[in-house]
Regions:
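Conserved SAM-binding loop
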Residues: 11, 41, 88-89
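Non-catalytic signal-transmission and effector/linker regions of two-component phosphorelay proteins
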Residues: 1-10, 20
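Two-component/phosphorelay signaling modules centered on CheY-like receiver
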Residues: 15-40
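Alpha-helical elements of the RecA-like P-loop NTPase motor core of helicases
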Residues: 20, 50, 97
Length: 126
């Protein structure tokens, strides 16, 4: 009997439309590849960080959010968990260099295209 591995994902994103599209992309990618994703949405990074436990395999994080931006949140995340895969989802491509300082695995540019999402996921999940 094959044991199904579930990939636990946190989506830290304040735009509901982006959350819905990311969750659709995860479901679509899972149907295509046989991967199973479980995700939790956090509308802002402070709650995510306050409740953070290293149970996530992957974190999708927006950069521009109120109260705390994604770069600050990523630095705090790395203090708690150095191994979680971190994927920034942003309109701001000029943050790429800073992203490497916090160990970002990938960047997905908004508006999100499924093709871009799938290409990044193929590279991230071996």
């Amino acid at each position: 009997m094959e044991v199904k591995v579930v990939i636990n994902v946190a989506i830290v994103e304040d735009e509901q439309e982006a959350v819905e599209y990311l969750s659709d992309c995860l479901h679509r990618y899972g149907e295509k590849t046989g991967e199973t994703f479980s995700f939790t949405h956090f509308p802002e990074p402070i709650t995510f960080l306050e409740k953070y436990k290293p149970v996530y395999d992957m974190v999708f994080m927006d950069i521009r959010m109120p109260m705390m931006d994604g770069m600050q949140a990523a630095k705090k995340l790395r203090e708690a968990d150095t191994s979680v895969l971190l994927v920034f989802v942003t309109r701001m491509g000029d943050y790429a260099i800073q992203g490497y300082d916090v160990g970002a695995t990938a960047f997905i540019k908004k508006p999100i295209s499924y093709f871009d999402f799938e290409m990044k996921m193929k590279r991230i999940i071996f």
